[in-house]
């Protein structure tokens, strides 16, 4: 057991599933909701059902507060550049479809990406846009110099996941951002496997668009996420969608010829996911109460422990990068002789243990409240199967 891990009782008390022996190590897919989050959701729903029902003033205060919390979380002094979105795909699509493209323009991606960071750009091929897929090195990494070498006079944009969903590789966003700035390229980051497990500083990293859903490491409800847009990108982006809230005075209902809002607000076209925003609000406050550094350090300790334990097993092949700076919260590996990782994962789930199988590999993704004892239990089951 990691030193001071016994102090996790207060963390674990927030997650009821830990009380019935359920071991949950699949936060790269979806996270459990804390008691604080479910209480906030219940209060909101109770008010809709039994209370004042319509409470727009309180709701809008929570929306504004949550926007400020997000800005603080990603290190920007510009909450007005944060747009609420339903998911990562919506957010990346807003960027891809909001830019003007020319025949022959190039976008640099990589072959490891989750489809959310590919399909919104692939549809641009109808305009003659060319997608350049970089191949990871032998350690499963896409390094900044590789991106630099792929840049041509036709390159317009680089998009990469902060952390790759399969092998858990964590990109050097700061160095990539510097390269994009040097060549005047737009820099887009899919943050869903990073935010909550690793720090992402949009200012230091010169990120033009940070897109994410919040149901994974951010531990919020499904169907809520956000898009951060830099000043540079705002000047180039035209809204890909429009609604009644996209104008300066939306409640001037009969005045159709109104000025449009800036693009970041323009994209919030209609009724927001208020319940999701309430949940995200409380979850972000919990991160700040615990300390974002503390959360990331706890995850790092668990990942280090898991990798060290796996390295003792000759039947294991780890595809997660070995250097701590190259990973965040995901550990992915194969086990020689395991016929079907999917069947094995399903058998564990029927016994109250949740991990995941992806592309023929086992993937474990612990959060700050998990313990080494839980990980040891899972690994013992894997190696005794």
Model-based region annotation:
Residues 1-385:
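Pyridoxal 5′-phosphate
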């Amino acid at each position: 057991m990691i030193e001071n891990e016994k102090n996790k009782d207060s963390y674990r008390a927030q997650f009821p599933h830990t009380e019935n022996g359920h071991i949950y190590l699949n936060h790269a897919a979806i996270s459990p909701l804390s008691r604080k989050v479910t209480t906030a959701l219940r209060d909101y729903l109770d008010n809709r059902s039994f209370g004042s029902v319509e409470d727009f003033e309180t709701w809008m205060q929570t929306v504004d507060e949550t926007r400020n919390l997000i800005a603080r979380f990603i290190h920007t002094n510009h909450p007005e550049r944060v747009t609420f979105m339903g998911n990562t795909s919506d957010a990346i699509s807003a960027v891809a479809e909001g830019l003007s493209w020319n025949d022959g323009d190039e976008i640099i991606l990589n072959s490891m990406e989750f489809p959310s960071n590919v399909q919104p750009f692939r549809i641009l091929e109808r305009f003659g846009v060319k997608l350049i897929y970089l191949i990871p090195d032998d350690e499963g990494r896409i390094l900044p110099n590789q991106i630099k070498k792929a840049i041509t006079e036709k390159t317009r944009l680089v998009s990469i996941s902060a952390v790759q969903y399969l092998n858990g590789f964590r990109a050097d966003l700061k160095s990539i951002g510097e390269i994009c700035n040097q060549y005047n390229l737009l820099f887009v980051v899919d943050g869903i496997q990073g935010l909550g497990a690793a720090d992402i500083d949009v200012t230091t990293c010169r990120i033009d668009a940070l897109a994410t859903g919040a149901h994974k490491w951010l531990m919020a409800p499904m169907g809520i996420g956000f898009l951060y847009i830099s000043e540079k990108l705002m000047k180039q982006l035209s809204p890909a969608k429009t609604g009644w809230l996209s104008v300066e005075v939306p409640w001037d209902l009969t005045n159709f010829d109104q000025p449009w809002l800036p693009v970041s607000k323009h994209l919030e076209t209609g009724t927001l996911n208020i319940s999701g925003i309430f949940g995200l609000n409380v979850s972000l406050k919990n991160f700040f109460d615990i300390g974002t550094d503390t959360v990331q350090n706890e995850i790092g300790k668990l990942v280090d422990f898991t990798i060290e334990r796996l390295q003792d097993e000759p039947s294991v092949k780890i595809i997660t990068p070995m250097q701590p700076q190259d990973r965040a919260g995901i550990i992915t590996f194969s086990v020689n002789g395991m016929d079907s990782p999917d069947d094995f994962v399903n058998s564990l789930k029927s016994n109250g243990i949740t991990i995941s199988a992806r592309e023929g590999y086992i993937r474990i993704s612990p959060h700050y409240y998990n313990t080494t004892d839980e990980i040891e239990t899972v690994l013992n089951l894997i190696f005794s199967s």
